[in-house]
């Protein structure tokens, strides 16, 4: 059985480059690989610079899926992503190709790799919790979630209001989960997880340079072009790191340096959460992103890459 290859890790660790190198090596062996995006913000059309989305010319003729599938006004949901990504992967496997799942959005990755089930939604509960978030802030919601579902509270953290609302909505629908296991559930399909790592003292300068590069490459102009398309009204897209700050810069609420510094701080915080999330993958093969023989070590871990 062909396994899913998952390339995961924090922002700035080189996931896209490694996934393309693996696909190239498989192609040299007569195997076909196709890449499936697992970065929530790369789902959006037009959000390219701030998400480090690979342009077509840089994709080395490797098929890419789950990119540019949503308008900025649409809400990205893990449940919706899970169904579509699994449909795509099933098609890749049916063609005898190797699916390479690539991304840093931890819950999106886990929703594909593991046997996650997502409860439905209740608009009345959601609206009530969103009003409470607007009135009291995320701290109160996080304290309540910590009592009702400690594992979810630890996973989400105290500042992600949107995810806190969703977690509390699920608790109200399904009941409290005080003893829910924090371990990953059963695999959906055989997979080999490659987790890229970097020491924090080397990752942080990469992240800071990445933010500077986003502004230099035209992120503010990209955001200016997306605002008429409804970016400010997008439940998910409007909150994307970098995009929210660039929009506030355009509105005169932040200077350029303030917008960049806020983006740097949020990017560092997000990277810490990514490291924590992927650190829970007990079966992952940990790979040092600085290793000169990174590709060889990655291929050694992949049954699909053996001639």
From Swiss-Prot:
Site (Interaction with substrate tRNA): 105, 126
Protein name: tRNA dimethylallyltransferase
Keywords carried by this UniProt record: ATP-binding, Magnesium, Nucleotide-binding, Transferase, tRNA processing
Pfam families in alphabetical order: IPPT
Assigned protein family: Belongs to the IPP transferase family.
Source species: Clavibacter michiganensis subsp. michiganensis (strain NCPPB 382)
Function: Catalyzes the transfer of a dimethylallyl group onto the adenine at position 37 in tRNAs that read codons beginning with uridine, leading to the formation of N6-(dimethylallyl)adenosine (i(6)A).
Stretches of the chain forming a coiled coil according to its record: none
Top-level class of the enzyme under EC nomenclature: transferase
């Amino acid at each position: 059985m062909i396994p899913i290859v998952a390339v995961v890790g924090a922002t700035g660790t080189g996931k896209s480059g490694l996934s393309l190198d693996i696909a190239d090596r498989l192609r040299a062996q007569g195997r076909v690989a196709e890449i499936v995006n697992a970065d929530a913000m790369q789902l959006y059309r037009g959000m390219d610079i701030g998400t480090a989305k690979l342009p077509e010319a840089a994709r080395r003729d490797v098929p890419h899926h789950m990119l540019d599938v949503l308008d900025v006004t649409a809400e990205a949901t893990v449940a919706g992503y899970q169904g579509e990504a699994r449909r795509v992967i099933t098609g890749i496997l049916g063609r005898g190709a190797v699916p390479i799942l690539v991304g840093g959005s931890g819950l999106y990755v886990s929703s594909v790799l593991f046997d996650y089930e997502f409860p439905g939604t209740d608009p009345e509960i959601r609206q009530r919790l969103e009003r409470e978030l607007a009135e009291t802030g995320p701290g109160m919601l996080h304290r309540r979630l910590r009592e009702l579902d400690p594992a979810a509270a630890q996973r989400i953290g105290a500042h992600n209001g949107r995810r806190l609302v969703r977690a509390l909505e699920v608790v109200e629908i399904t009941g409290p989960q005080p003893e829910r296991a924090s371990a990953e559930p059963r695999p959906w399909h055989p997979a080999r997880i490659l987790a890229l790592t970097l020491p924090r003292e080397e990752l942080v300068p990469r992240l800071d340079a990445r933010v500077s590069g986003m502004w230099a490459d035209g992120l503010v102009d990209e955001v200016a072009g997306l605002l008429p398309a409804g970016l400010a009204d997008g439940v998910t897209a409007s909150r994307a790191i970098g995009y929210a700050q660039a929009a506030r810069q355009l509105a005169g609420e932040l200077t350029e340096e303030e917008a960049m510094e806020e983006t740097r701080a949020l990017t560092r915080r997000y990277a810490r959460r990514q490291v924590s999330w992927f650190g829970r993958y007990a079966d992952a093969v940990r790979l040092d992103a600085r290793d000169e023989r990174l590709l060889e070590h990655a291929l050694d871990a992949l049954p699909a890459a053996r001639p």
